[in-house]
A protein has these predicted regions:
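N-terminal hydrophobic or amphipathic helices/low-complexity stretches enriched
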Residues: 29-78, 136-137, 257
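Acidic/histidine-rich catalytic neighborhood of metal-dependent amide-processing enzymes
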Residues: 167-256, 531
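Sec-exported extracytoplasmic/periplasmic mature domains
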Residues: 53, 64-72, 87-96, 194, ...
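A non-catalytic alpha/beta surface segment that caps or lines the substrate-entry region
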Residues: 62, 72-125, 129, 140, ...
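C-terminal segment of classical bacterial N-terminal signal peptides
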Residues: 18-27
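Bacterial N-terminal signal peptides that target proteins for export
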Residues: 1-14, 24
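Active-site metal-coordination/substrate-binding segment of hydrolases
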Residues: 119-208, 514
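Metal-dependent amide/peptide-bond hydrolase catalytic core
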Residues: 29-31, 37, 43, 246, ...
Length: 536
């Protein structure tokens, strides 16, 4: 007779949970026996594939139901519905679950599951909230998921969702907000649990799950949630399931992520618009002031010119240099696909540039253009900027450096709209509004957990995943590292052309299938590989 999987809380058994309950329409299987020998990576993947091929319609249906719930972080009512739905998904798999107080923000969903004979605990992370949407930019309704027979960019058509027992084409895509970022990871985790259960394969580690509800809104309440639940979240390591695969199409194990912080700048000209003929060359133009200010912070090759900005950047280690050299080049292909005649830094590789900090101008607003253009000097100009940070840089220090740079350019800094006295006293004024942010992380690639996770992710794979030092995008990994003090590694599964954060977001179905296999292999193998990787 098979044994039970038990729920855990900070290493203590708090109740029994049968690892047998499947989604509606999927026959429940008995839990795996702890007496069985460890399954090989190849057998785990074969069992996962067999299960998935028999249940593609059921997986798609559960996924689409989750995608249909609007998930913009500031939409409190619908965020609550998402949390409830994710909890129900966990409970259907026998996972003990609860919400963690959001400290004034959206709740985090927590789950726990003990595996027989496991000696280590790993937390799997994803987020259930999504970016805001502008429905006018979407081909279809953002929260009405549709299946297309390929990429919309290539003219793909809407096709029916599969009926029970039907298979899905790997190159078809599901379009909806959060299809790739990050609900694909949630359904892939759930399906991996189902596949392991159906194959009689026990996870090699005790599993915990943490699903955040405000990642896309800056994770402003995350630190307090973690600090209030440190015992509950005690684990040996975290796996962040977010982001895209490599641009070559290969899966990747990523050992860190860049940090991020945002900034809004406003420069000021005359109190009212002035005729450019009567006052041009006399009244300061805020558009020119802003353009000059941006150019003083960043050159055409992406180099950040702010004094001291790069002083604390952590050097690339020998292991990271080796990993970067093994990443397949994609730059020529990407330049062609994106119709770029050249890229920055003398056409340096994308893999290399991701390892450096970046200053991105995400928008500029001033005056009018085309049919709205007027021959006038505008009153103000605004620029929206984001910084991508690398290890050893902190948002606090970057803020100090940026503000010192603005002052060195002769600007008086204000936090709100300047009053009359301020305007007539200071020749150059800039309003500075900082957004929340967090630092970067980069786990060492040669510690036992890093080696074990890479080995588990590679086990049984026809093409092993790439080992990548750092993700170009940002995740709040530093907050977890600072509060919980454990290593974190990222396992992305989305297609790289998923339109993340944009209209017509999508997940390629084969990426979802591959992600289920990847998560199942890691759950089933990482504990065994960890033992073999252990060093004094």
């Amino acid at each position: 007779m098979f044994k039970k999987f038990r729920a855990i809380r900070a290493g203590a058994i708090v109740g029994a949970a049968m690892f047998v309950t499947a989604p509606a329409g999927i026959a429940a299987q008995q839990p795996a026996s702890s007496a069985r020998p460890a399954a090989s990576g190849a057998s785990v993947r074969a069992a996962t594939r067999q299960y998935r091929e028999s249940h593609e319609a059921e997986i798609a249906r559960e996924f689409v139901e989750l995608l249909a719930i609007p998930d913009v972080a500031l939409d409190t009512a619908n965020i609550g519905r998402n949390a409830t739905a994710v909890m129900a998904m966990l409970r259907r798999r026998g996972v003990t679950t609860r919400t963690l107080d959001g400290a004034g923000g959206p709740p985090a969903v927590y789950g726990e599951l003990r595996s027989p004979n496991a000696t280590r605990t790993v937390v799997f992370y994803a987020h259930y909230d999504g970016q805001p949407v502008d429905p006018s930019q979407w081909t279809g309704a953002p929260f009405t998921p549709v299946l297309r027979d390929g990429s919309l960019a290539a003219g793909a058509k809407v096709i029916p969702m599969p009926a029970a027992g039907e298979r899905m084409r790997g190159d078809s895509r599901i379009y909806a907000r959060s299809a790739s970022d990050d609900k694909a990871a949630i359904i892939a985790m759930m399906s991996a649990l189902d596949a392991l259960r159906a194959g009689g394969i026990a996870p090699s580690v005790n599993l915990k799950f943490f699903f955040e509800g405000e990642e896309e809104a800056g994770s402003s309440h995350l630190r307090r949630v973690l600090q209030a639940n440190t015992e509950l979240l005690r684990a040996d390591a975290w796996v962040f399931c977010d982001g895209p695969v490599h641009q070559s199409g290969r899966q990747q194990v990523v050992f860190g992520a860049r940090g991020v912080m945002g900034l809004e700048l406003t420069t000021y000209g005359p109190l009212r618009p002035l005729h450019s003929g009567h006052y041009g060359n006399w009244a300061p133009n805020p558009a020119v002031l802003m353009a000059t200010l941006i150019a003083s912070m960043r050159d055409d090759d992406g180099r950040i010119l702010i004094a001291g900005f790069n002083d604390d950047v952590r050097p690339i280690s020998a292991a990271e240099h080796t990993a970067l050299g093994a990443i397949p080049p994609v730059d020529t292909t990407l330049r062609r696909a994106l119709q770029l005649g050249a890229t920055e830094a003398g056409n340096a590789s994308l893999a290399e540039r991701i390892m450096a900090p970046a200053l991105n101008v995400r928008g500029i607003k001033v005056g009018g253009v085309r049919e709205l253009a007027a021959n006038a000097i505008p009153t103000e100009a605004s620029a929206s900027i984001d910084f991508r940070l690398v290890p050893n840089q902190t948002p606090e220090h970057v803020r100090q450096l940026v503000e010192a740079h603005l002052r060195s350019r002769g600007y008086h800094l204000v936090a709100d709209t300047p009053d009359s006295a301020t305007r007539v006293t200071h020749p150059k004024i800039v309003r500075v509004e900082w957004e929340g942010g967090y630092a970067a992380t980069r786990a060492p690639m040669d510690i036992p957990f890093s080696r074990a996770l890479l080995a588990a992710a590679s086990s049984g794979a026809a093409t092993p995943p790439l080992a990548v030092p750092m993700l170009g995008g940002s995740l709040p990994t530093s907050t977890f590292e600072q509060v919980l003090g454990v290593p974190l590694v990222v396992l992305p599964i989305a297609n790289y052309d998923n339109n993340q954060h944009a209209a017509n977001e999508n997940i390629r179905v084969q990426n979802l299938w591959d992600g289920i296999e990847l998560f199942a292999a890691v759950m089933a193998r990482v504990g065994h590989e960890w033992k073999e990787s252990a060093v004094p």
